[in-house]
Amino acid sequence: MRLRGAVLSAACAGMIFCLWFVFVLSRRGQVVEAAALEGSKIGAHYVAGHARTLLSVVSMPAAGVLVAIILIIGLLRRSHRRAAWAVVAVVGANLSTQALKYWILWRPDYDITARMDNANTLPSGHTTMATSAAVALILLSGRRWRALSAWAGALFAIAMGYSTLACQWHRPSDVIAALLVPVAWGALAVAGGAWDSASYGGAPPAAEEDGAERDEDHPDADEAEGPEGPKRPESPEGAGGDSTASTEEADRALHRAPTTSPAILSLRTQRIGNALLTLLGAGSMLVATVLGIWVWTRADELVARRVLFASYATGAAAVVGVGCLAMAALVSLTDWGAARHERLP
């Protein structure tokens, strides 16, 4: 799990710089994104009002308050390690966005946009804050709630990102990069041990895991295990019964229980939910890829209305795709296999 977290974090960081290289440093990339901004004005009266409302209601301070509430809930549930790593992820993501935007990345002036300063706007600060809240929610969730948290977080982050695009606040690459920055930090938190728990047969969980994490990830642990390990069903024949038959019956009962446990079924449901989120993201990325190739090969025809709208649709589809895939990838770092070793009554 830790290695996969480090790999996902590095992959997100690499994709951010790829976005910058393709859509900011290259002239054609800037032309395509300028077309996407122009295309967002087509039919804007249908969505711009709702987008502005969302951006005004869920402002940067409001998003910060939301993150604080999520972290406080985590502390109240005694998920201290997860809450600490969530703080690291949120603070690191937002500081990284500001550093990337103002100090590390730059935007060559190809005389394409009307902005006099032609300032770099990658990544989007609003989308970073919204995605940070989503990542904090996922990090603080137990295994049985992470897929649901990913769906909620993806919807929130995508809505914020799309709103900045619809209102011409940001270009598509700005939004996509802002979706990746917090996920990179979330994956780094997992690599650092945010979701670690004692493995089956190893040392007992840390003190903080006796609270919320033990209740969610190891339900009924106190009933299933005693001082000497997992309880075995009592022999129906009493102390004088056949000890061999009793032992075999107990072993069969212990191996049958996990397959019918509601907790295990819940975990399976979460895996299915995460798979559906992945499929939605993959489908959106397929649409974005097909449209993007078509638009990229028509960079000289970007004054045509259909090409302008296709550029905008490409960016919107890519925002949905990356938002879903990034959240699903973070949840996929969960050690689902650990649940198979949980002996529940």
Language-model segments: residues:
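Hydrophobic alpha-helical bundle signature of multipass membrane enzymes
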Residues: 1-117, 138, 298-327, 331-341, ...
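Actinobacteria-biased recognition of intrinsically disordered, low-complexity terminal regions
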Residues: 1-8, 199-272, 325-345
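Residue-identity detector for glycine
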Residues: 5, 14, 29, 39, ...
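Exposed boundary/loop context
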Residues: 22, 118, 154, 219, ...
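Membrane-embedded catalytic cores of phosphoryl/pyrophosphoryl-handling enzymes
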Residues: 114-210, 246-302, 308-312
